[in-house]
Amino acid sequence: MAKDYYKILGVDRNASEEDIKKAFRELAKKWHPDLHPDNKAEAEEKFKEISEAYEVLSDPEKRRIYDQTGSVDFGGGGSNFNWDNFTHFSDINDIFNEIFGGNFGSDFFSGFGNRQSTRNIDLDMYTNLDISLEEAYYGTEKRIKFRRNAICPDCKGTGAKNGKLITCPTCHGTGQQRVVRGQGFFRMVTVTTCNTCGGKGRIPEEKCPRCNGTGTIVVDEDITVKIPRGATDNLRLRVSGKGQSYDGRTGDLYVILRIKQDKNLQRINDDLLLDQKINFGQAALGADIPIQIFNEKYNLKIPEGTQPGDVIKIKGAGMPHLNGHGSGDLLVRINVEVPKRLTAKQRELIRELFDIKENHKSWFH
């Protein structure tokens, strides 16, 4: 049967976020399990119920789904709430401060939200790799050398000789250490990761001699990374299983590409822009001139009357698309060179040209 979260908190279905929070705080203080030592089981169940209602109604998206369907999926395809689903421990901590006057948890919460899991440790590694635009154009292979922590091959990451582990004598397998303050039902508990086992709950019966019980050894890696054709700046290449190792797990290495600027070419997405100089005669009369980018040669057709700054496109001669289908275009921007020194004959011809210009609206009509 679906739960009526509004009824549980005692609020109207149109209640504001502030009304919902206020109702939860009042009920949480009323039903805190440490205040009901003679009926703790009922108090714990009631406290969990109002916390479930608050988790749903205080979240706009969860509340919207609940209002439409009458239930909320807390993960795993089911609607059963547990404390792993609760995301408002800071609100409960504020309530604890009001009740007990200190920033402490409770026996009731000693197992929720406090244990640090090694699963949350980021074991991935990241490194930048500089490549040229030409290398990005053709694709290439690059060697990378680096140092990392790898799983000890002798103990397989357990840190124990022959892989034999025993229950931690300090935390008795919980991975936690608790400090209790106060007496009776005003007990206040802080929970920390066990210093002996590091939160694992088990320790080596005898330390592995190769890694001295750490489960990892330092190794120097020398690997080859394949750079794909058409690689882009900031592209991340994942090398599986070459990250840091800890607690029997290993992360990945991410190689982040940095493409250096080319002195002749500018990349615009998958197009390439090339500045090409031509002389006055080629611009005026038109011409066919050879051009080259990297190892690729093309014939550039200059139309008659080409102006400075005109862009001529060679379709499909740009960067290869990263997905492997087709390429961008090569854009050739024309720069018309004006000679700084002229022979007498050249001067005479230019004067004749200007004489023609005086009788026409433009040089070329």
From Swiss-Prot:
GO molecular function annotations of the record: ATP binding; heat shock protein binding; unfolded protein binding; zinc ion binding
Gene3D superfamilies recorded: DnaJ domain (1.10.287.110), Heat shock protein DnaJ, cysteine-rich domain (2.10.230.10), Urease metallochaperone UreE, N-terminal domain (2.60.260.20)
Main location: cytoplasm
Binding locations of Zn(2+) 2: C168, C171, C194, C197
Reported cofactor(s): Zn(2+)
Protein localization: Cytoplasm
Residue positions binding Zn(2+) 1: C152, C155, C208, C211
Annotated CXXCXGXG motif repeat ranges: 152-159, 168-175, 194-201, 208-215
GO terms for cellular component: cytoplasm
Domain J residue range list: 4-70
Record keywords, A-Z: Chaperone, Cytoplasm, DNA replication, Metal-binding, Repeat, Stress response, Zinc, Zinc-finger
Zinc finger map (CR-type): 139-220
Cofactor: how and how many bound: Binds 2 Zn(2+) ions per monomer.
One Pfam family recorded for the sequence: DnaJ
One example of a Gene Ontology biological process annotation: protein refolding
Subunit structure: Homodimer.
Function: Participates actively in the response to hyperosmotic and heat shock by preventing the aggregation of stress-denatured proteins and by disaggregating proteins, also in an autonomous, DnaK-independent fashion. Unfolded proteins bind initially to DnaJ; upon interaction with the DnaJ-bound protein, DnaK hydrolyzes its bound ATP, resulting in the formation of a stable complex. GrpE releases ADP from DnaK; ATP binding to DnaK triggers the release of the substrate protein, thus completing the reaction cycle.
Comment text on domains: The J domain is necessary and sufficient to stimulate DnaK ATPase activity. Zinc center 1 plays an important role in the autonomous, DnaK-independent chaperone activity of DnaJ. Zinc center 2 is essential for interaction with DnaK and for DnaJ activity.
The family this protein is said to belong to: Belongs to the DnaJ family.
Protein name, entry field: Chaperone protein DnaJ
Species this chain originates from: Thermoplasma volcanium (strain ATCC 51530 / DSM 4299 / JCM 9571 / NBRC 15438 / GSS1)
